Swiss-Prot record:
Protein name in the entry: Translation initiation factor IF-1
Pfam families: eIF-1a
Keyword rRNA-binding assigned: yes
Domain of life: Bacteria
Gene: infA
Compartments it resides in: Cytoplasm
Keyword Aminoacyl-tRNA synthetase set for record: no
Domain S1-like positions: 1-73
Complex formation: Component of the 30S ribosomal translation pre-initiation complex which assembles on the 30S ribosome in the order IF-2 and IF-3, IF-1 and N-formylmethionyl-tRNA(fMet); mRNA recruitment can occur at any time during PIC assembly.
Primary location recorded for the protein, binned into one broad class: cytoplasm
InterPro entries documented for this protein: NA-bd_OB-fold, RNA-binding_domain_S1_IF1, S1_domain, TIF_IF1
Gene3D superfamilies for this protein: Nucleic acid-binding proteins
GO MF entries: ribosome binding; rRNA binding; translation initiation factor activity
Originating species: Nocardioides sp. (strain ATCC BAA-499 / JS614)
Function recorded in the entry: One of the essential components for the initiation of protein synthesis. Stabilizes the binding of IF-2 and IF-3 on the 30S subunit to which N-formylmethionyl-tRNA(fMet) subsequently binds. Helps modulate mRNA selection, yielding the 30S pre-initiation complex (PIC). Upon addition of the 50S ribosomal subunit IF-1, IF-2 and IF-3 are released leaving the mature 70S translation initiation complex.
Amino acid sequence: MPKKEGVIEIEGTVVEALPNAMFRVELSNGHKVLAHISGKMRQHYIRILPEDRVVVELSPYDLTRGRIVYRYK
């Protein structure tokens, strides 16, 4: 799959699960962001729990919100 241009991918750990499939994620650099699950992960019923290691995509326009695109096994 080709990489998207202009997005920042960074690893993090899920700190808490919020309503509506939103999660608070602490990034590897110490920042905390609000993230939602990507559509493909929703389609395939991939569960995300607190303490899971994930990859988050951030937009350069708003670095406080992101999209969870991968959960490490």
